[in-house]
Every structure is written in structure tokens, then in C-alpha cells.
Amino acid sequence: FMTFYDGCLYVGCFTKYTDSAIARYAVDDQGNLINTMDEGLGMNFGMAVPLDYSTISEQAQGMTFYNDKLLLSHSFGILPSRVVFYEKSDKRLYVDENSAVSYRFPERIEQIFVDGDDLYVMFESAAYAYSSASVNIVDRVLKLSLPKMEEYQKRIQSNVSQY
């Protein structure tokens, strides 16, 4: 999975049961990856080298950004999916577990995309290969209001802090 944000290409990979990683790559004005030749890394040819990277939890399927927050979708099999919002971190390429806010979704979430204040969510539960084993079949792209999601989260936190 990958996304483009703030002049950089972010790339991640899916893993089932072990931590995965995301990496950030520089892109020039024409949209090409910026290649580097670093003899200290044993390179005798130019290639794209990540500006930075971070480990993320397993089963990530999609990635996007909203208001300088990193959003990752996580899913595998028939277990509930989740979208996790991470605040920007100076230490770990956005992935600060202490700042994570998680939203639960039906199983088999895949790609996520932000346009303005809207989050678009796509599932694979209606695909032929998975529909017979899926409890909740979502056969369309969902459009969700990110300000409403954040407002809901603030209300939940406010109610919890009262106790």
C-alpha cells in the first residue's frame, strides 16, 4: 500500500503476524523518486533510499493522511477491522502508539483515502473469494465525515474522564 503526502511517497507492506514497516521517500518536482548513491551503505549505483521509516503493527492494509495525522487501516480474515489515527511524532515517522486513536470497522477493510474532510473506506468482504466467509459484507465504498468521527471521539473521552 502507498500514499503521497506533503511532497513525499509513503510506502508500507502487509504482514500477517509480525510488525511491518512504512517508509518515506523523497520525490522531485516531476514526481520521480530521488535516487541516492551512498557508498557508506555499500551502494555503487543510484537507488531510492528512504528518508526515514518506522515499524507499524501487523495487518496494515491502507494508509492516508488527514490534518497532519497518519491513518492506517488494519484487517485480516474475519476479525473486526480498525482504522488507527496517529499524531505526528518527531521520533518515529508519525507512529506514536501513545497518541493512537482506533475506530472499529467490519472485517476485511482494505484501502482508505482522504479527500478534504471525508474518509473513503473500501472493503474486500464482497469479493467472490471472501463473501462466503464474511459475516458483514460491505459491497460499496463508504464515505465518512472525519470531523464527525473526531467529535465522537472527543465525546467518548469526555465521558470516560468524568468517571
Describe the function of each predicted region:
Residues 89-135:
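C-terminal structured domain segments
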Residues 12-15, 73-75, 122-125:
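Recurrent small/Gly-Pro-centered beta-turn motifs in extracellular repeat architectures
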Residues 1-3, 55-62, 104-116:
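Repeated scaffold domains used in trafficking and secretory/extracellular systems
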Residues 6-8, 67-70, 116-118:
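Short coil/turn segments that connect the beta-strands within blades of beta-propeller domains
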Residues 30-57, 93-106, 156-163:
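Surface-exposed loop and turn segments in beta-propeller and other repeat-based domains
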Residues 43-93:
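Loop/turn-rich, solvent-exposed surfaces of beta-rich toroidal or solenoidal domains
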Residues 17-28, 78-88, 127-155:
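Structural motif
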Residues 1-51:
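Hydrophobic, aromatic-enriched interface-forming segments
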